[in-house]
Regions:
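Catalytic Tyr-x(3-8)-Lys segment
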Residues: 120-122, 224-246
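Catalytic loop of short-chain dehydrogenase/reductase
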Residues: 97, 110-116, 140-185, 190-199, ...
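C-terminal substrate-recognition "lid" of short-chain dehydrogenase/reductases
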Residues: 240-267, 272, 278
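A glycine/serine/threonine-rich, flexible loop-to-helix segment
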Residues: 50-52, 106-107, 199, 209-235, ...
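Short, small/polar-rich loop/turn modules that mediate ligand/substrate recognition or access, typified
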Residues: 198, 203, 260-263
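Conserved glycine-rich cofactor-binding loop
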Residues: 12, 19-20
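Conserved glycine-rich Rossmann-like NAD(P)H-binding loop of the short-chain dehydrogenase/reductase
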Residues: 33-49
Length: 282
């Protein structure tokens, strides 16, 4: 089919933040598709958890402990991937941590706000830009020379996918100001990279998940159970926490399609619509 790679088998990818949540679900899917993935996370994955599901998978995942905000981390990540698998075909930038404020913004220490902003920007847009470009410098010599087929489309391309957030599309909550600002900056970086790397036959896209059954949302609703109850009582959409694996089809699509770039796919079951309505009504 024009516009699609036939398979991820034999492809090599980099994924950050792959020991839990979205990242872990994506890694398992990629390996099941025959891809080899170098996974980088500040948290170590228990050996048993890594080996059990890999035994029957056609691909392979190698785990490395790495803080993506450390000096020289992006170059090191690419170098380790090349040493392990010999090439880079795609990158999934997924690592993240949301800083939430307990106080209202009018009462929040400005020093605390500034520190949170610095941390979130280092973790999201800065890490995205540096890792994407470090990987692109390796991918471009292989992918830029690929000629178009008789339909005018190139039969293969490099790919970068970034995990954004519904807060990047509709930043509404003051407790997530730093996180939302950093994710919005990621959106800008993603689009700039798409424009810059397109001529090199490297596509750059994003997914924007909503509240999922991961640690952050569970903690938020644990603090504010009435918000969840209020939203779920009046929504006609899909109120439940999304399973982390729900992002997998979108990620696989963005990694295998050879035409789409500069695009964000929202993945929140319509939940953000009701969340926006809730906060606007308060």
């Amino acid at each position: 089919m024009s516009g699609f790679q036939s398979s991820l088998a034999g492809k090599v990818g980099i994924l950050t933040g792959g020991t839990s949540g979205f990242g872990y679900a994506i890694v398992r899917a990629l390996v099941s598709q025959g891809a080899n993935v170098a996974v980088f996370s500040v948290d170590e994955l228990p050996a048993a958890a890594s080996l059990e599901w890999q035994r029957s998978a056609p691909g392979k995942a190698e785990y490395f402990t790495q803080d993506i905000t450390a000096r020289g981390a992006s170059e090191k990540i690419v170098e380790q991937t090349l040493a392990c698998f010999g090439k880079v075909d795609f990158v999934v930038v997924n690592a993240g941590l949301a800083i939430r404020f307990e106080e209202s913004l009018l009462k929040l220490s400005l020093e605390k706000l500034a520190a949170a902003m610095r941390t979130q920007f280092e973790l999201f847009p800065i890490a995205l830009a540096t890792l994407a470009l470090a990987a692109a410098r390796v991918m471009a010599p292989r992918y830029a020379p690929i000629p178009p087929d008789d339909t005018g489309h190139r039969p293969d391309s490099g790919a970068i996918v970034v995990t954004l957030s519904e807060t990047a599309l509709s930043p509404l909550r003051d407790d997530l100001l730093a996180y939302a600002a950093a994710k919005q900056a990621c959106l800008s970086v993603m689009r700039s990279l798409a424009a810059t790397l397109g001529p090199q036959n490297i596509r750059v896209n994003g997914i924007a998940p909503g509240f999922a059954n991961t640690a952050g949302p569970r903690k938020f609703y644990g603090r504010f159970p009435q918000i969840r109850a209020d939203i779920e009582a009046k929504t006609h959409l899909l109120p439940a926490f999304m399973d982390p694996g729900a992002v997998v089809p979108a990620v696989l699509y963005l990694l295998t399609d050879n035409y789409v770039t500069g695009t964000v796919i929202p993945l929140d079951g319509g939940y953000n619509i009701e969340l926006k309505r809730y906060f606007q009504d308060q």
